[in-house]
UniProtKB/Swiss-Prot annotation:
GO cellular component, one term: cytosol
Catalytic activity: NAD(+) + (deoxyribonucleotide)n-3'-hydroxyl + 5'-phospho-(deoxyribonucleotide)m = (deoxyribonucleotide)n+m + AMP + beta-nicotinamide D-nucleotide
GO terms for MF: DNA binding; DNA ligase (NAD+) activity; metal ion binding
Keyword DNA repair: yes
Binding site for NAD(+): D31, A32, E33, Y34, D35, S80, L81, E112, R135, E172, K288, K312
Gene giving rise to this polypeptide: ligA
Protein name from the UniProt record: DNA ligase
């Protein structure tokens, strides 16, 4: 292929990508792929300058404006920046700057994160916002004035005084990670389009023809410079940004000075380490020579300034090929598809696998084996397939099919059924998840179940990592969690990683695990959708394993943060004969649950007959209607037996008819009586004079743990505080009741002193626990 042919190909491909990105709001390749194509074209044109044409993508920035918006000409072009991908690139930039300025000493730079959003221009005349425009092709953009006026942190009128008659502010409109998550959740619930990432969401939201849609989106603005000015407003980049801030315009909180390129590199590394904890997406750091005089001296080249550069982070998105789709089996039997990829480097790490979640996700993506896809990796998150590049689909691409048999144990694979319950009715539909029915007879499920059971936040059996568990299962030594308590010294010693001392330590740890808290034991069972916090709610509210096992789904919904779907997962788990057998085996092994007791006083005190009626989900009867009904008819028997006249004395006609219709159904009568019987058996009393109960001693209080505790772990301390009703927070505020400070306590202790919050050292904390009847 000749250079001219390749140049024409690259221009055509880049033009198509620009059109998809800027006009259709449908990016077709990751930024890293675009950069590679652009740099290849740039290099070829440098080798063959006679082939450079005015319409080449290297001679302009971006793509054409949408015809639906009126066009705006930028008096000062909105140029893009050159890129540095390696430290060597940044050092070379610094060398060129020093050489161009020919000045002694370190050059002063401004440093700020490169937000991943949409570049915009805001024009203020006499302090009033009169125009907003996109970058467009750098010379001509789109008039989005109505839309930028809806972005809440863009001032419609500047604050203070002294601003020039004409002030053009430039910056980035973006969407925070939290805002993006909220938007996608709302879009999914409404059956609308969801977005691949915050950048696409911001661009798509800002370029809506209907500004009401833009106003509903969680957009934010951050300024990074100025364009046309009727008069100077500063002699340095940072000085200008600080002045803009004084006039009410938001600037980056991460804006800093750097003396020389080495300090720039230190800033880049620091931001890189904190990148995933920032509330917004960034794709690099921008460095600018701070002095405006120095900027003027350095000047510009074709499409970028010589005094600024964007130091990009390793790409979070890349293109690669799906070589195959395999299926893995998890702890609950879920058969999950995993994409096997042609290895590619993403965010500095070589990626060869990516999660596909379930078959609904594969259908949503339209994925086939052999497709070229965009994958994304952010921080420690498992790489995900974001999009299929349909233009690159080969003719022999194959559909993904779910195996009919478990790839591990050969048991049947079944599709889950989703049961929706509303207004007393049930509807069933197919779920997105497929499950192996093999339970603990399936090696994959057994291993994952044991790994979860022994984990630190579950039974906390030290010395049993994933490899050790896999070895014990593969050797046939354990076939269920209860088999851990049957292990003998002679069976373990000599296995890989187990000498005599380590074997004895393991057996001691297993023996010590026989005295767990109820919450830890529930969590260790691996009930679907029951995490650590839900396990604590179950233990704290119901007080005993027997009550948790017996609880009806409707009763479980009375507990904090447990909805009906999760309640059915819990109920179905304990109804299952296989699970009952496993639990009984564990109890028979000598398990002694430490904190079993009575029903939580606040739970018993807060559960009323009216509350029970409201939870029955009778059409049009909410909490207020239920209260009125119980005020007139003070028992369930009376409510069930009531005729239309009695009911209409308590409720509006529509509600009364709904109650009567509901209880005509004998199944509903039985359900209501079963719920009441269980609540009464658990210790509830409908008579208010019998319902006086004392709350937990720390109910309503917020405590904070800081430093290293020597007599117990922080997790154990947290469990003990929560058992007394306290909320354990991660930071100190004016609402904090007490701080427990061990050795090494730092900023939290200082904050407590500043706010006058009570502080206990570990000895005082242990004494306090003893006073509450809690041993350490």
């Amino acid at each position: 292929m000749t250079a001219e042919t390749r140049i024409l190909e690259l221009r055509a491909e880049l033009d198509q990508h620009n059109y998809r990105y800027y006009v259709l709001d449908e990016p077709s390749v990751p930024d890293a792929e675009y950069d590679r194509l652009f740099n290849e074209l740039k290099a070829l044109e440098a080798e063959h300058p006679h082939l450079v044409t005015p319409d080449s993508p290297t001679q302009r920035v971006g793509g054409a404006a949408l015809a639906a918006f009126s066009q705006v000409r930028h008096e000062v072009p909105m140029l893009s920046l050159g890129n540095a991908f390696e430290e060597a690139d940044l050092r070379e930039f610094g060398r060129r700057v020093v050489e161009g300025l020919d000045q002694p000493g370190a050059v002063d730079y401004s440093c700020e994160p490169k937000l991943d959003g949409l570049a915009v221009s805001l024009l203020y005349r006499d302090g009033q916002l009169v125009q907003g425009a996109t970058r467009g092709d750098g010379t001509t953009g789109e008039d989005i004035s109505a839309n930028v006026r809806t972005v809440r942190n863009i001032p419609l009128k500047l604050q203070g005084k002294g601003w020039p008659a004409v002030l053009e502010v430039r910056g980035e409109v973006y969407m925070s990670k939290a805002g993006f998550d909220r938007l996608n959740a709302a879009q999914a619930e409404a059956g609308g389009k969801t977005f691949a990432n915050p950048r696409n969401a911001a661009a798509g939201s800002l370029r809506q023809l209907d500004s009401k849609i833009t106003a509903s989106r969680p957009l934010e603005f951050c300024c990074y410079g100025v364009g046309q000015l009727s008069e100077s407003i500063g002699d340095s980049h940072i000085g200008i940004l600080e002045q803009l801030k004084a006039w009410g315009l938001p600037i980056s909180r991460e804006l800093k000075h750097a003396a020389g390129i080495e300090e720039c590199l230190a800033y880049y590394r620091d931001i890189g380490e904190r990148r995933n904890s920032l509330p917004y997406e960034i794709d690099g750091v921008v460095f600018k020579v701070n002095s405006l005089a120095a900027q003027r001296e350095l000047g510009f080249r074709a499409r970028e300034p010589r005094w600024a550069i964007a130091h990009k982070f390793p790409a979070m998105e890349e293109l690669t090929e799906v070589l195959d789709v395999e299926f893995q089996v998890g702890r609950t039997g879920a058969v999950t598809p995993v994409a096997r990829l042609k290895p590619v480097k993403v965010a500095g790490v070589t990626v060869s696998n990516a999660t596909l979640h379930n078959m609904d996700e594969i259908a949503r993506l339209g994925l086939r084996i052999g497709d070229t896809v965009i994958i994304r990796r952010a921080g420690d998150v498992i790489p995900q397939v974001m999009q299929v590049v349909l233009e690159r689909r080969p003719q022999d691409a194959r559909p993904v099919e779910v195996p009919s048999e478990c790839p591990v144990c050969g048991s049947q694979v079944e599709r889950t059924q989703l049961v929706k319950r509303s207004k007393g009715k049930e509807t069933t539909s197919e779920g997105a998840v497929y499950r192996c029915v093999g339970r603990l007879a399936c090696g994959a499920q057994l291993k994952q179940a044991i790994i979860h059971y022994v984990s630190r936040r579950a039974m906390d059996i030290d010395g049993l990592g994933e490899k050790s568990v896999e070895q014990l299962v593969d050797e046939g030594l354990i076939g269920s969690p209860a088999d851990l308590y049957k292990l003998q010294f002679e069976q373990v010693v000599g296995l890989e990683g187990f000498a005599e001392v380590s074997t004895q330590k393991l057996l001691d740890a297993i023996e010590a695990s026989k005295r767990p808290s109820l919450a830890r034991f529930i969590y260790a069972l691996g009930i679907p959708d029951v995490g650590e916090e839900t396990a604590k709610v179950l233990a704290r509210s119901l007080g005993s394993l027997a009550r948790v096992q017996q609880a009806l789904p409707q009763v479980l919904t009375y507990l904090p943060d447990i909805g009906l779907e999760v309640a059915y997962e819990i109920h179905n788990f304990f109804e299952d004969e296989h699970n009952q057998k496993v639990i009984q085996q564990l109890l028979d092994s000598g398990m002694q649950l430490q904190d079993e007791g009575e029903l939580a006083a606040e739970f018993a005190a807060s559960t009323t007959l009216a509350g029970m009626i409201a939870k029955l989900d009778i059409a049009s009867v909410g909490p207020t209607g239920a209260e009125k009904l119980v005020a007139k008819l003070d028992s369930l028997d009376k409510i069930i037996a009531a005729d239309g006249i009695d009911l209409r004395q308590a409720l509006a006609a529509k509600q009364a008819d709904a109650v009567r219709e509901f209880f005509k159904d004998e199944a509903n009568q039985k359900l209501a009586r079963d719920i009441e019987a269980q609540l009464l058996a658990f210790g509830m009393h409908w008579s208010s004079e019998k319902k006086v109960a004392e709350g937990l001693p720390l109910a309503g209080q917020t405590w904070v743990l800081t430093g290293t505790l020597e007599r117990m772990s922080r997790d154990i301390a947290k469990d003990k505080l929560e058992s007394l009703g306290a909320k354990v927070a991660g930071s100190v505020s004016g609402k904090t009741h007490c701080v427990v400070a061990g050795p090494g306590a730092g900023s939290k202790l200082a904050k407590a002193a500043e706010l006058g919050v009570k502080v206990l050292d570990e000895d005082a904390f242990v004494t306090f626990l003893a006073e509450q009847g809690i041993a350490v």
